[in-house]
Amino acid sequence: MTLDLPRRFPWPTLLSVCIHGAVVAGLLYTSVHQVIELPAPAQPISVTMVTPADLEPPQAVQPPPEPVVEPEPEPEPIPEPPKEAPVVIEKPKPKPKPKPKPVKKVQEQPKRDVKPVESRPASPFENTAPARLTSSTATAATSKPVTSVASGPRALSRNQPQYPARAQALRIEGQVKVKFDVTPDGRVDNVQILSAKPANMFEREVKNAMRRWRYEPGKPGSGIVVNILFKINGTTEIQ
């Protein structure tokens, strides 16, 4: 039994119990021997009565001044845009008329007296018979007459020849004179170039266009002559 005591009561526990017991004993001792000090008696207070001066009547509390409301400034009038001055169109001044040129007076030439021509008697050696026609003139008179466009068949459509590009680039004008026949069905046949100025420039276009020409059928014609003009502005004219 004696050997188990140290195990049940260890030293740290005993030390803690002793410290707590000492603290409790100290607190009890200080509470018993505490000196109670009485407060010192209060000293007498002397009071002097003073008659208060006539109190001034309380001034009336003035209400706070009302805030002054400033009047809103009137809006400034919007200035009107300046009116545009009317545009005055000046009338064109009439051109001064040219002064008439003074007409020169034609001096009248004095009339000359014309003497009547005396008729001479006919000489027996003079030949008063009309000259005989030569063989060439007689052949021309008996040849086939040339039919003009106005008196020939009536054209239904005549396409204008195309202006050659080379001639138009060189700004060349030209004229081609053509003779042709019209068949009974109104087609153009036997085309002949009578003249071309300049040569070898417009003839091919003229022939190509005349292939498409059409005349009134049933009215054939032969030896019809027309002039085709090529103008510098690229147009053609058939005369």
Swiss-Prot record:
Segments annotated as Sequence repeats: 70-71, 72-73, 74-75, 76-77, 78-79, 80-81, 91-92, 93-94, 95-96, 97-98, 99-100, 101-102
Compositionally biased residues, Basic and acidic residues: 105-118
Job description of the protein: Interacts with outer membrane receptor proteins that carry out high-affinity binding and energy dependent uptake into the periplasmic space of specific substrates such as cobalamin, and various iron compounds (such as iron dicitrate, enterochelin, aerobactin, etc.). In the absence of TonB these receptors bind their substrates but do not carry out active transport. TonB also interacts with some colicins and is involved in the energy-dependent, irreversible steps of bacteriophages phi 80 and T1 infection.
Assembly behavior: Homodimer. Forms a complex with the accessory proteins ExbB and ExbD.
Disordered: region residues: 55-162
Membrane topology recorded in Swiss-Prot or TrEMBL: Single-pass membrane protein
Outcome after substituting residue 51 to A: In strain: ECOR 28, ECOR 31, ECOR 37, ECOR 46, ECOR 50, ECOR 52, ECOR 60 and ECOR 71
Amino acid composition bias (Low complexity), ranges on this chain: 128-151
Periplasmic-side positions: 33-239
Region feature 6 X 2 AA tandem repeats of K-P, mapped onto this chain: 91-102
Gene that this sequence comes from: tonB
Compartments in which it is found: Cell inner membrane
Residue ranges constituting the TonB C-terminal domain according to the UniProt record: 148-239
Outcome of swapping residue 87 to A: In strain: ECOR 37 and ECOR 71
Span list, region 6 X 2 AA approximate tandem repeats of E-P: 70-81
Bilayer-crossing regions: 1-32
Origin species: Escherichia coli (strain K12)
Keyword Cell inner membrane: yes
Domain of life: Bacteria
Protein name in UniProt: Protein TonB
Any GO molecular function: protein domain specific binding
Family, per entry: Belongs to the TonB family.
